[in-house]
């Protein structure tokens, strides 16, 4: 095989590789942007009226054990998104991650609930879901 044919084959293979990776990279950029925006919202006091942010209770950007204002310890949010939907005893029903986020916004931050499909909720859920990357999905009531 000549050098020219080898070069043409190498270029063709590179073009094919780019054709397969470009859509994945294009999809990754908006996801990374949503995760970043969610992290910003998580740290901002703009979701409520009490001057608090999500990090008031969920310390370390949700990556470490937190504490409620009453002193009750709460677990880190690492892997938490992978546990939804789940049954909530206090609510007496199955809740989604979006419902839990809105409960925290309304009760903890004194804010107005977000639209479950609005851009702020999508960003917050994207951020919280990123904290579950690589964690096993925990489906209540299912035994392995």
Give the label of every model feature segment.
Residues 15-17:
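Classic N-terminal secretory signal peptides
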């Amino acid at each position: 095989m000549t050098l020219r044919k080898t070069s043409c084959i190498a270029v063709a293979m590179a073009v094919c590789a780019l054709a397969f990776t470009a859509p994945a990279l294009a999809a990754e950029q908006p996801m990374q942007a949503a995760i970043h925006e969610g992290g910003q919202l998580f740290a901002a006091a703009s979701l409520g009226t009490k001057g608090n942010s999500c990090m008031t209770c969920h310390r370390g950007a949700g990556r470490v054990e937190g504490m409620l204002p009453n002193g009750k310890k709460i677990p880190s949010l690492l892997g938490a998104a992978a546990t939804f939907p789940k049954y909530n005893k206090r609510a007496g029903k199955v809740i989604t991650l979006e419902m839990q986020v809105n409960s925290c916004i309304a009760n903890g931050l004194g804010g107005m609930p977000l639209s479950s499909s609005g851009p702020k909720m999508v960003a917050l859920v994207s951020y919280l879901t990123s904290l579950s990357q690589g964690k096993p999905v925990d489906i209540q009531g299912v035994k392995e």
